[in-house]
């Protein structure tokens, strides 16, 4: 990691070691408080590789380190309620999903109007494909739908969205519902070869949650990050 940052990003070695030493000792508040400087550079490269298949969009992502993916979800729901969504506003939840995404919107402090769309497509042999129908995806065209929550790959089936579904959602955002906020939880994306997140396909509208715990087998460490492109819908709204 030390050599990588020096060789790939021309990091000042003294500043880098100083940041790491202070992080381990914990004698100061982190600066910047959302994520440390060199940590952000390193994680940006990692997300570009794993979430964008080494083909990231132009520009950089602003990152916010959190105490695991569940904490990231809590911060996001609170921020959405405080700044973007009111009680009764419509959101779409693509299921199966990580359980808190189902339970949190039901709390009295949020009371969002939740529309669930289910991955219930079958093949000709009656086998479950864990994919979504075009008719259900087209419900996102309504401007009454303010936010889309998706776990990709899904949890627990661990199926990625099909390329056709990804393309259909991107088209809907661009042509029908340009103010749709997409919150995508891509914790299992690192298990899928050549994975492309919504943060790669439509970064302007996307807020991404990624946790390191599953891929690195370190659930108890509670390490995750929220990623938002520097040019984004949320700042506009």
Language-model segments: which ranges?
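Conserved core of the PLP fold type I
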Residues: 7-176, 189-203, 207
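Walker B catalytic acidic pair
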Residues: 186
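Conserved core segment of the aminotransferase class I/II
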Residues: 12-13, 204-237
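Residue-level marker for buried hydrophobic side chains located in beta-strands
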Residues: 182-183
């Amino acid at each position: 990691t030390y050599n990588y940052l020096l060789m790939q990003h021309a990091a000042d070695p003294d500043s880098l070691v100083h940041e790491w030493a202070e992080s381990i000792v914990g004698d100061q508040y982190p600066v910047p408080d959302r994520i440390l400087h060199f940590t952000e550079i390193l994680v940006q490269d990692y997300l570009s590789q794993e979430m964008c298949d080494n083909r990231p969009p132009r520009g950089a992502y602003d990152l916010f380190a959190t105490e695991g993916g569940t904490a990231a979800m809590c911060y996001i729901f609170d921020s959405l309620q405080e700044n973007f969504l009111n009680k009764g506003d419509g959101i779409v939840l693509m299921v199966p999903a990580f359980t808190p995404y189902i339970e949190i919107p039901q709390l009295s402090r949020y009371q969002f109007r939740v529309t669930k769309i289910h991955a219930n497509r079958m093949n000709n042999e009656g086998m479950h494909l864990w994919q979504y129908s075009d008719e259900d995806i087209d419900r996102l065209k309504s401007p009454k739908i303010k936010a889309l929550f998706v776990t990709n790959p899904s949890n627990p089936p661990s199926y990625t969205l099909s390329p056709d579904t990804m393309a259909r959602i991107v088209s809907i955002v661009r042509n029908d519902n340009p103010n749709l906020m997409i919150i995508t939880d891509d914790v299992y994306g690192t298990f899928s070869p050549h994975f492309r997140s919504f943060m790669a396909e439509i970064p302007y509208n996307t807020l991404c949650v990624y946790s390191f715990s599953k891929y690195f087998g370190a659930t108890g460490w509670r390490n995750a990050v929220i990623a938002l492109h520097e040019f984004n819908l949320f700042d506009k709204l």
